[in-house]
Amino acid sequence: MNNVISSKDNHNHTLVFTGKGGKYFVICLVNFLLTCITLGIYAPWAMVKCRRYIYTNMTLNNQPFAYKATGGALFISVLLVFIIYIVSLSLIEHGHPGLGFTLFGLLIAIIPFMAVKGLQYQAMMTSLNGVHFGFQCSMRRAWWYMFALPVLLMVALYIVLYIISLVTIAVGGLVFSIVFLGLLAIIGIGVINGITYSKWMTLFGNGANFGIHRFSIQVNVKTCIRGCVLAMLTLFPFAVVIGYLIAPVFTDMILLSMMGNAQAGGALILQYYGQIMACYFLYFLAIIVVTSYLYVALRNLFLNNLSLANDSIRFHSSVTAHGMLWRLLVVFVISGVTLGLAYPWLKIWLVSWLAQNTQVQGDLDSLELTNDEKPLENSPLMWISRGIMPYFPFI
């Protein structure tokens, strides 16, 4: 193993992705065929092969990443979770609802613990220049940030909206109440997302390591909330237009129902078919717009505040919301038109763009490359969690 990561430029190192769409297409095609033939059993191996191709073709200063996870480990994990789920349903259906719901509830409650163990496994299976990544954090804190806090915030938002609705309906009427409460709900969800994601960033950033070196991060909660609220507010104009287009449909359907002519609903749908399809289009467009803005805001906030080895190495993300938006639109539209055949090329194109806008800043020559000798945990919880791959929109 090399003792240092060699570099000509010790200040700014851009990730380079060398993957090819044609090769990735062959991998995806073989994976799809084998997954269909095996009725889905091959899916974990397919996932590992796709991820391994992405990792091994991603280089930092001419050093490729490595990914050593196995499809067998993921398959056993998914199988164990599936068995627990089936057993709980079987208990409910065969006269033991208390025991069945308890088992199912426990499975839901330990999802944060499984996410942590899944992150540990994925980190240990990822390496750069022979040095493995790692992840450790408090299980109690993970459960609070990933499960309890979001649930409590959503309950609090529901209570606040319910109390406000009692006032707005009496003062401004039904239409005003719907619009006002809709706007408040969007803002409230943005605030909840901002608080939750800021805690997740802190948990993940301060819990990760590269060999013997620790990552660290300081996230401004207000900045995270502002980014999430602005992302959610992009939904509002779409919601207004969709409501304007779809309101006549519901109004006419209610009138037909009151007149006892509900059977004419089919003809009514045909009459408003264009407006209904426009609503579907605007709905999916709104999702892409929100996803683009939210992903860019969170990714830039996370990477631009992340550091390694006592701030000697820092990271920078320069992706833009408009760049992400039009790329996602191209991915969805062309993938849909080609029935998914173009997706491998588009995925490689998107990953390459993300790599070009990700930099590592610092003197990599002086970074000691020594593995953390802590072995991979082999507990039952780890076995059941290896197939859990939590998605964080800021990575």
Swiss-Prot record:
Residues in compartment: Cytoplasmic: 1-24, 93-95, 168, 251-275, 349-395
Entry membrane topology: Multi-pass membrane protein
Keywords carried by this UniProt record: Cell inner membrane, Cell membrane, Membrane, Transmembrane, Transmembrane helix
GO cellular component: plasma membrane
InterPro entries to which the protein is assigned, alphabetical: DUF898 (IPR010295)
Compartment(s) where it occurs, according to its Swiss-Prot or TrEMBL record: Cell inner membrane
Residue stretches spanning the membrane: 25-45, 72-92, 96-116, 147-167, 169-189, 230-250, 276-296, 328-348
Domain of life where this protein originates: Bacteria
Periplasmic side: 46-71, 117-146, 190-229, 297-327
Cysteine pairings via disulfide bonds: none
Keyword Transmembrane: yes
Protein name: Inner membrane protein YjgN
